[in-house]
Amino acid sequence: MEGNPHSIIEGMLIAAVAAGSDEGYIYVRAEYPLAVSRLKTAIAKAEEMGLLGDNILGTDFCFHLHVNRGAGAFVCGEGSALTASIEGNRGMPRVKPPRTVEQGLWARPTVLNNVETFSNVPLIIRRGSAWYRSIGTERSHGTKAFALTGNVVNTGLIEVPMGTTLRQIIFEIGGGIKDGKKFKAVQIGGPSTEEHLDMPLDFDSLKKVGAMIGSGGLVVMDEDTCMVEVARFFMNFTQNESCGKCVPCREGTRRMLEILTRIVNNEGSLEDLDLLEDLSSTITETALCGLGQSACKPVQSTLKYFRDEYLAHVVEKHCPHCNGRKKELHIDPELCKGCGKCMRQCPMEAISGQIRMPHVIDTEKCIKCGACWGCCPFGAIREE
């Protein structure tokens, strides 16, 4: 959206011709002002050249494209919640069927895709499907953009062919683990361990181990990371982002967060582990949308691969990685863009700063809930 917005516009135009659409919307989080600005500029230029609007290039084909800024709710990544938000309603998923292709925006059939998908369309049209299928694996074609963050030397946005292994991404592109420490896990849907380093990143391989590509986030963790705290952190994020419409997600994630918090504070019991597993299965099977259905993956995978760390908390009442303590949170001034998202999310008003200037966390007020860490789009929140 920031680097080549014209490719998205071209892809949506091609899709509009194929589907017979005359209206299009690009839904962007308000926290990405540069993307919004460049998309609007690109749309205006396309309209000036007669590539958007009425009677495009002298034909009867008309297509109007709009940029819609979202309020930042994570659940609006779900199709029906996204369309509800564009319509001016609260972003909440609905029961399916009907699906968006049958009854989407304003009850009309709606083609809904990620901007990454639309940007690939012009290249496929120009070079052919055989060219596109030659990249990636037999069943997962093309490339994928990932946000590589965490305890790795080189962080940032990367684009790799589907089927690239985690080892290649972390150690060749990412430069390995910071400070010469050992690799422990990487979060992709759920934490994947050292035994998964040579696993290709494609849809089938990830599905087999209970992970998923999702939004393309890769969070690398080193040997000092407490995996129980990781599970608690991601559950806290999901619970905060739950729209509250369905009981399994609204109440289930809250109960799981309470249990995980007890365990991290060395106040849990062995029965809590069984309860976590039962709740995980129930929420996954009964939640209304993908947010709730995937909410328990970090808990399920950490219980499977790092159960010894849960036992250290509940049996020995001592964690070798965090000793029951939570580290202090700080904002990296070099990464912070001053978007203000963390200030709005902080329940204790512990974050201050001017818009477009680095923000600061007041460690005296901070309760280390992780809300800022979960919402920061730039990965600027650090634990020390």
Where on the chain are the PLM-derived regions?
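Histidine-anchored nucleotide/phosphate-binding helix
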Residues: N4-A18
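Structured functional modules or segments
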Residues: I367, A371, C375, G379-E384
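Hydrophobic alpha-helical positions that pack around
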Residues: V36-M162
